Amino acid sequence: MPRFLPEPPHRHGNPATTAVVLVNLGTPDAPTAPALKRYLKEFLSDPRVVEIPKPVWWLILNGIILNIRPKKSAAKYASVWMPEGSPLRVHTERQAKLLKGLLGQRGHHLTVTSAMRYGSPSIPEVLAHLKAEGAKRILLVPMYPQYAASTTATVVDEAANWLTKIRNQPEMRFVRNFHDHEGYLAALEKSVRQHWQTNGSLGDNDRLLISFHGLPKRSLDLGDPYFCECHKTGRLLAERLNLKPEQFQICFQSRFGKAEWLQPYTAPTLHEWGSKGVRRVDVICPGFVADCLETLEEIAQEGRDDFLKAGGKEYHYIPALNEDDAWIKALADIAEQHLGGWSTKTAFDPHALETSAREAFKFGARA
């Protein structure tokens, strides 16, 4: 088997284009048990996601989880599925389209597309397509505001693995995080204030719950900065909203398994608040820039049930940033910052490219 993937012949006179790729977690292709089984197998087989000895985890995953979870998860996905497909994929594709338009308005000549770490379109598929189209410079933007080894790092891993198979590699850059980016925080603040304009501000007996996806506590103990970056995002957002400490709480959702995860946990907090007389809860999930199963089902549906059944009176989920104009502007600012030094504002001159190719051939270059 060849060490490298087949490479098209080098062609003189082709423009060196630039591409931006928005990368999110991933999604099954359909809200069905078979599709969920394929997706979960890929996702939960990533050693960045599950740090358990491989032989032990293989038995648990293939013997138990993949025989139980797909059917249950399929029903949950079906409850949030959009006519166009999975919410996460739909919103990410829309974000890429809007980002391309805004960067174009700012004078950039580049391609903007999206990829998924698990499922399709995969990172290798998208990178291979961009390379075939002539991309020589690629900026990957993992859509995770807070860095974690199980999210951002595995995107870098997958892209780097693809690069090891490429003879003629493009330049590649990665955005590490943007948890304290001014534009991102401003977009979050705007979404909360717009919600309050419609539903009223928080009263004395109301709370804002700032919920992030959870990780095993072991990740923090081993040096992962995710917990600290989540707290910084939550604290800065609360400051912008002029909230007192007793008016908000940072929590972590989606606990899986019996191990201790980052705390406090979202679901028990909602239950406790409802049982202790908190009247209203507004929930925002800053770690998700596009709505998905974890926000639309776990928070918007299950969270509401937990709080109201425990005695709460009013519950609101504040949607993810999705296609909000302030967020797309922030995303463009983030992309521009990391595109620095790459020539993206100069239109290609076909005559100059043709002349360059002609000169190369004159001095013996291969056609």
Curated annotation (Swiss-Prot):
Keyword entries, A-Z: Cytoplasm, Heme biosynthesis, Iron, Lyase, Metal-binding, Porphyrin biosynthesis
Subcellular locations according to the entry: Cytoplasm
Record-linked InterPro entries: Ferrochelatase, Ferrochelatase_AS, Ferrochelatase_C, Ferrochelatase_N
Entry's EC annotation: 4.98.1.1
Chemical reaction(s) catalysed: heme b + 2 H(+) = protoporphyrin IX + Fe(2+)
Superkingdom of origin: Bacteria
Record-annotated membrane-spanning stretches: none
Gene Ontology MF term list: ferrochelatase activity; metal ion binding
GO biological process assignments: heme biosynthetic process
Known pathway: Porphyrin-containing compound metabolism; protoheme biosynthesis; protoheme from protoporphyrin-IX: step 1/1
Gene3D superfamilies: 3.40.50.1400
Keyword Iron on entry: yes
GO CC annotations on file: cytoplasm
Keyword Lyase: yes
UniProt: Fe cation binding residues: 213, 294
Cited NCBIfam families: hemH
Function: Catalyzes the ferrous insertion into protoporphyrin IX.
Family: Belongs to the ferrochelatase family.
HAMAP family with a match to the protein in the record: Ferrochelatase (MF_00323)
Descriptive protein name: Ferrochelatase
